[in-house]
């Protein structure tokens, strides 16, 4: 017998108690100095076991984290005084454990890491720390795992940031930070789109009318550049405040000379390959902006109402009119249009050759039936009230619908195919021109209208295509302001979208050509900046022909990874059906199209020499040179003697050509970057915008896509799924989310990490919601996550890596905890790789906040606080806690980097990477290496622990019953009885109840003072138990009983034990606490620092 135990030989009761203590697992470990931290420490050996394949059942519990939100294991019912020592919790009769004489022997948590985030001050402090130490560059430069390039789509430099910007930039930052932890060299160059109408309008709106009149192109450009640069600076500071890491000192701006030169180069390459041409054809035209627009510059708001009409044109003859001779001169072609103002430009009527058409006699008009139908205002034309005989040609299938629409009886007189009408002639309803009937395409259907289409090649894409086929005149009597020109005769000077439209309808009615006028609600294109309607108008423009490389583009699309996968369908449909791209704009603020025009013939001069010369000038002087330099200076040497014969073009390039050239201006020019990029990530609207313009320019010039993967996100809506609008008062401002508003109660300052947590929580592949309630929820989750990390820090205040307990020596509960952790990390890594951040959020929330806090942390408090500072069970628990802290920090760091860094800066122990390198900042850590030994936790034990945790939940239910009946207060006042007919389960439970390793005992897992496993159900014993319960587990019932715990309450750990009173020097202690006190006598009281609950 050792001298330690011999000292109790004179007291048999004390000797017996000490014999029990001797057999316990709470042995004292000798302390080790960590002043000289070695590379191969015990913790290093413990952590670094190598990458492994997944063992059987390795995902058993992780699936419950990530896919079964209401079925988390280890989730217990609510209990008061849950832990063995709850220093800051309530005790009966005002008792506080730390007020006793043994308070200095209790290892309470200590940390300088506060519960409150103080984001307003702490986050900027951390950002300053990162910036001063160039952490982003430092980590990227030191990584050696290859490069990763997420190419930034440039936002417009024309206003404050909104939640869409926040969603976009934070998603990018999460990806970049994850790749840093994966040992990649991350190159992220932020960009801004600085040209175009949006910025030009902002400048013009800020000027007085008189100042606008005096603006020269160069003065306007100077003001636009100044505005754009100022906005870039403001937006950049906001992005930094979001916690976004980027090369902020070297962003790319589309107004930079080197970028503009690269754009000119792309244009030149396309032109030299024959993909750029100039022609007169209908394009989207904005009268409010006085410029052509691309498809990506249009929007289709709800609620647009057009004035649609049914009109008739008098048939006068033609190739096959013999079959219609009997109806002449009272036969007409009936057409329907939603743009009556295009009637002056009518050049033909198109039919579908394969459809059946009928001559119908119009009879029995009833004015009472023509007022209002289905909330659509209908006004009949005078021709319907005319008593003369009237025959019209319409598609046969539409006769019933037109009868109802017009309020008439239509009697079919003759039926024939549309092909029979080709080359028939009719009289133009306004200027009496002789016009043909032509065969159109599949766009002519019987879904609406009359089956005959009014065709104006100068005002529609399909009409234009039909006009080319038949050589129809390209008439477009509309000017830049959207007003009729002199070519429109009596309508000249009238706005086609206003009084001009009304005037045309009135003229048709007065001349007996209007059958019906009707209000028609439909999608109609608006200028996305001025929010006003656009028109189709034929003008001289520069186009990029897509047809020459459409097949190559479609092939490239199929070789790109699209997230979500269905996005490939959208961009494929848009690309396969898109018309030629109108790339010229009639604005001043942009990159010029480098074309010179002959003064007399207007023929353009643009070849390899002229383009390269202009590119060279712009690369040095910027695109302003086009406006201030003479034609002679802008032309190459060999053309200067002809300079007087040419003038500079005034068109600028579409801003989508600007941003669509970024792969050339950035990826192809910046050191450290390469083409193609790994990822493009933008909103879903960019399928017809940046994704497509980048793809087209790249395929046309390089023959391949500029990206390997494309990720798209939805729009940000309010909590009710409504679009945000100032008028509705539902706008969420990212600045106010971070910094708070004037009323801190209504608009609290949440900080950037709460906003980032929200970004990770939503399934961004669709539209996402945000609002006050959602932000409060995110703040609550953040607070709980912070509390979990604070618990870990506090309980590792005296931890050193040399204290690590080898895996094989750990209690089973600790080995199980590491098995769970490894599967969580493995699952999270898979989610990061697949960009499924919302699943990561779910896993982190359930694992750290629910399962760790409610199970492992709950039962760990006993051995952490009272097991003895250097005891085996405390050190084994700290081994697990330190591993959890190091892993959790790394998996959450991409999402909440400020929190992760704040924790790291408060780390109470020194830690080095496996290669021996120090980690001054959290992102200097490497991603956790999967540990084969931890993942190989035996499958049968995995299943047993699942059953045990379910049993724990049922035990808590019975404890709650006992508590409600006032039999117990704390669960430590209880003794639990168990019985199951499952012999294997019973043996396992009995083994645990008698475990020498006290950490694995049932009473510690249930947080009760005693647990007894019954081999049989004796009536006498069962009747003495006050509260019982049972549940079905498999094919067997498990019986649970609860009674008052035996023995007295230990003053130090609050467990009930028959040993209390056995030690004369310490009569209020149980045997375990007595052994700890004897081995580690209490020191004089020292004030605890930042004690945790």
Curated annotation (Swiss-Prot):
Keywords, sorted A to Z: Aminoacyl-tRNA synthetase, ATP-binding, Chloroplast, Ligase, Metal-binding, Mitochondrion, Nucleotide-binding, Plastid, Protein biosynthesis, Transit peptide, Zinc
Protein name from the UniProt record: Isoleucine--tRNA ligase, chloroplastic/mitochondrial
Pfam families: Anticodon_1, tRNA-synt_1, zf-FPG_IleRS
Gene giving rise to this polypeptide: OVA2
Coiled coil feature spans: none
GO BP term, pick one: isoleucyl-tRNA aminoacylation
Compartments (UniProt record): Plastid, Chloroplast; Mitochondrion
Motif ('KMSKS' region): 723-727
Binding site for L-isoleucyl-5'-AMP: 682
GO MF assignments: aminoacyl-tRNA deacylase activity; ATP binding; isoleucine-tRNA ligase activity; metal ion binding; tRNA binding
Disruption phenotype: Lethal. In heterozygous plants, aborted ovules.
Reactions catalysed: tRNA(Ile) + L-isoleucine + ATP = L-isoleucyl-tRNA(Ile) + AMP + diphosphate
Binding site for Zn(2+): 1050, 1053, 1070, 1073
Keyword Kinase: no
Cellular component, GO annotation: chloroplast; chloroplast stroma; mitochondrion
Taxonomic source organism: Arabidopsis thaliana
Alphabetized Gene3D superfamilies for the sequence: 1.10.730.20, HUPs, Ile-tRNA synthetase CP2 domain-like, Valyl/Leucyl/Isoleucyl-tRNA synthetase, editing domain
Span list, region Disordered: 69-103
Protein family: Belongs to the class-I aminoacyl-tRNA synthetase family.
